[in-house]
Amino acid sequence: MRTYVALIFWIVSATLRAQIACPCNPQDPETLKERQCALCAEAEKQSAGTVVFFVQDSSPRKPDRWLAIPRQHSPGMHHMDQLPADVRAELWRSAIAKAKELWGENWGIAYNAEKLHSQCHVHIHVGKLIDGVEWGEFKVVDGPEQIPLPGPDGLWIHPVNGKLHVHIGEQVAETVLLR
């Protein structure tokens, strides 16, 4: 029962946090000092030529997770569809390369539903895939350039026989990754 109550509390609080507008504006560096979004502050630290960078997930409950983050950002909440197609493709490519480097072919990457974002900067969760997960409908694609836009819903991706299975419509997509 306690677990159920904690889960409900987390979902409600994440939803409320996500509905608060992000004050970060890269054109006004003073707004980044508020540190409302740690990922925006990290993006500002990266060199101008960086397209995608990685940070280890800071949650102690997710010690083996990484976040793939595009350096590019804009004022307010950032969504995947706001990234230019070339940056989005590089984000997917880089996340997949990092996942393969860490976990071989037993990896997964996830983009949670927009209403559940607790950080305003776009990011992809990179982790080891939980054994045996494969449910719901999915689209089979050949590579990162074919990954569809998630829209407001989340998605998660994993490899199967040299292709990518893209599961669309998952709200909390990162639950398929080991903590």
Tell me the role of every PLM-derived stretch.
Residues 1-4:
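Positively charged n-region of N-terminal signal peptides that target proteins for export
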